[in-house]
C-alpha cells in the first residue's frame, strides 16, 4: 500500500494565501494529498468552508492555525492542531493579534508612502474580505504597483526587517502560545524554527522550556529550515520524544512552495490526532 501523503501547513486567503479555503481543498485533492491541515495566521475563519469542501473528496482535513508569538526580536510561529476554536483564551488572543497586525500594517504603509506611490487602499485591494491583514498584502500591493517582481522580492527589499519601513509586531511569548493551544485541547508544534538567516530561532534552553510548557512537536521537514538546523532539531525531537512534522507552507501563488513538497509520516499524524482533545479531523 502506498504511503499516505500528509501536508500539515497551508494558508488560504483568510490570511496570506491566495486561494479561498474551498479552492485550497481542491488544490490538495489535485496534488494527490490524503491529508491536509489548514493553518491560517491567527485565524480559524476558514475552518467551516474548508470542512464543507472536503465532503466526498476522500481527503482528510486537519483544522489548525499558525499562532504568532515573539521571543525578543525573533518571530516564532506556533502551529496548533485540532483545538477548540471557541476556547475563550485563544479567541481573545487571536483577536488581539489580528488587531495588532492591522495597525502594524497601517504604520508600515504610512512609512512606505513617504517614498513610494502606495496607499492603504492599494493594500486593501489585495486582501479578501475578512482576511487577517499583514505584510504579505503590502508585498502584493508593491508587486501590483510595479515596485517588486514578486512577493519574495518585496520582502527581500522594501519590506526587509532592516529597511527603514519595518515595524515590529506585538505577540505573546512562545510559552504563552504553547499553553493557550494546550488549554484549548490542541497540539502545539513549533513551525520551521531553523529558518535560513535566523537560525536558531529558539535556543536549546528555550526548547527545554517550551517542552516543559507542553510543546508536543516540531516542524522539521520544511524548505526554509537549514540542513544543519534540521539535524539539530531531529536530535532535540529524539531527546524529548517530540512529534516530527513536515509540510509545504503552501500559500497558493503567494510563494513558490508546492503542496506536498514535504510531508509528515502517517504515524506522526496519528500522534497528533491521539493527543488532541479539542477537535477532530474532518474526513471527506
Give, region by region, the residue ranges found by the protein language model.
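Extracellular/periplasmic loop regions
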Residues: 258-262
Amino acid at each position: 500500500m502506498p504511503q499516505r501523503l500528509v501536508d500539515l501547513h497551508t494558508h488560504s486567503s483568510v490570511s496570506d494565501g491566495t486561494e479561498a479555503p474551498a479552492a485550497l481543498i481542491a488544490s490538495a485533492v489535485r496534488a494527490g494529498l490524503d491529508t491536509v491541515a489548514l493553518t491560517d495566521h491567527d485565524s480559524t475563519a476558514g475552518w467551516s468552508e474548508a470542512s464543507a469542501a472536503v465532503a466526498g473528496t476522500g481527503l482528510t482535513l486537519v483544522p489548525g492555525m499558525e499562532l504568532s508569538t515573539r521571543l525578543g526580536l525573533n518571530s516564532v510561529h506556533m502551529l496548533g492542531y485540532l483545538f477548540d476554536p471557541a476556547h475563550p483564551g485563544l479567541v481573545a488572543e487571536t483577536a488581539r493579534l489580528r488587531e495588532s497586525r492591522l495597525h502594524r500594517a497601517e504604520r508600515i504603509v504610512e512609512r512606505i508612502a513617504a517614498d513610494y506611490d502606495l496607499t492603504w487602499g492599494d493594500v486593501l485591494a489585495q486582501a479578501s474580505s475578512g482576511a487577517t491583514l499583514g505584510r504579505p498584502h503590502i508585498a502584493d500591493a508593491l508587486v501590483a504597483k510595479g515596485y517588486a517582481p514578486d512577493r519574495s522580492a518585496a520582502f527581500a527589499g522594501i519590506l526587509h526587517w532592516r529597511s527603514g519601513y519595518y515595524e515590529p509586531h506585538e505577540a505573546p511569548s512562545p510559552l504563552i502560545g504553547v499553553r493557550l493551544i494546550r488549554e484549548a485541547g490542541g497540539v502545539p508544534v513549533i513551525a520551521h524554527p531553523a529558518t535560513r538567516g535566523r537560525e536558531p530561532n529558539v535556543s536549546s534552553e528555550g526548547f527545554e522550556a517550551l517542552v516543559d510548557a507542553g510543546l508536543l512537536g516540531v516542524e522539521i521537514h520544511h524548505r526554509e529550515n537549514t540542513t544543519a538546523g534540521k539535524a539539530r532539531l531531529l536530535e532535540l525531537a529524539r531527546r524529548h520524544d517530540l512529534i516530527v512534522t513536515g509540510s509545504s507552507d503552501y500559500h497558493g501563488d503567494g510563494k513558490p512552495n508546492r503542496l506536498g513538497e514535504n510531508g509528515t509520516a502517517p504515524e506522526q499524524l496519528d500522534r497528533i490526532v491521539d493527543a488532541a482533545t479539542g477537535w477532530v479531523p474532518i474526513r471527506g
